Amino acid sequence: MIVLVINSGSSSLKYQLFDMRKEALLAKGLVERIGLSGSMLTHRPIGKDQVVIETEILNHDRAIQLTVEALTHEDHGVVASMREIDAVGHRVAHGGDTFSDSAVVNEQSLANIRALFEVAPLHNPPAVMGIEACQHMLPGVPQVAVFDTAFHQTIPGYAYNYALPYELAAKHSLRRYGFHGTSHKYVAQWAAAMLGRPLEDLRIITCHLGNGASITAIDRGRSVDTSMGFTPLEGLIMGTRVGDMDPAAVPFLMEKEGLTTGQINDLMNKKSGVLGVSGVSSDFRDLEEEAAKGNERCQLALDMFAYRVKKYIGAYAAVMNGVDAIVFTAGLGENSPSMRQSVCSGLSYLGVQLDEEKNKGRGEADISAAGATCRVMVVPTNEELMIARDTYRLLKG
């Protein structure tokens, strides 16, 4: 089965094409600035030269059309025709409590995704545009929606409910949903394989640390708690998101600074986090570089980030009555030995002990010292492959 994976944003569209017989990546690409000036497609076929096509791309229909044309081109294509594309898998951010698993796209599932626009106004509408564009450009090709929230639907009620008036919270579906579920699920499965143990026997804490960051407690294969909440704003300090904060600070700031609801939302989502603390950047590489030069605010931002991660690890170890493995993934988790060291220092009571030399390496690795009872691992995430796997799983029958 040849599966096209689509991650559709409001003005961009990422794609990857997989041959699921071997789980082989055939090509990947990015369509940028949809509906804006300077739009382009960057196509990267495996084993061939990269191709950049600069052209007017008014909407997602045109973006998908260009994607299919690139994949089937006689020079830089990787399949002979669009008829070879057997299925399309879409990343959809929010499945609410409607979807506890990925779902084949049909009239009902599409209506249910649209019904969640109110709780995911930035992410779900572009996903639907991508789905509809594929329906237009690849008629008859089955599609699957894979939800960032679905993996977390196993979280128990005492962990996902907020202590608001019960009827009010239920009326507005106001609860913890969690995100990055596809990534957390993938790296947990891979870590179990690396350890040579069944996932169902393990207590794993997965740390997806990038510009967006979240932590999940996975008890014997099931998500039992996660740091992001009703939206991706809750939990860890992030590149530009504030993370956990006293909610009373919101009306206080609105009153003192004369901010609207939109402005305070923008402040907490786009101007806070390590960017807000450092005043320098949301990119952790920049912060590490500046901190090494003596920038105290950059160091403070890094220390605050590491402390929050460590605090969640301790909490989730308590939730699961221990932990067998801690997994680092995503941009910062995979590529920053110093951040992994900062997070893991002081966790010896959990059986955590890093091997300093292994921690300096790159790529997939068990970076624990010999004899450590809690394994610390680095696993590069691959959300696109996980989406392709779910698409294949639901359609192969």
Swiss-Prot record:
> What does UniProt list as catalytic?
D148 (proton donor/acceptor)
Enumerate the Gene3D superfamilies for this protein.
Answer: 3.30.420.40
Quick check: keyword Amino-acid biosynthesis in the entry?
no
State if rRNA processing is listed as a keyword: no
Q: How is the cofactor bound?
A: Mg(2+). Can also accept Mn(2+).
Localization terms from the record: Cytoplasm
Which keywords has UniProt assigned to this entry?
ATP-binding, Cytoplasm, Kinase, Magnesium, Metal-binding, Nucleotide-binding, Transferase
Q: Which residues are listed for Mg(2+) binding in this entry?
A: N7, E383
Write down what this protein is called: Acetate kinase
Q: Which organism does this sequence originate in?
A: Heliobacterium modesticaldum (strain ATCC 51547 / Ice1)
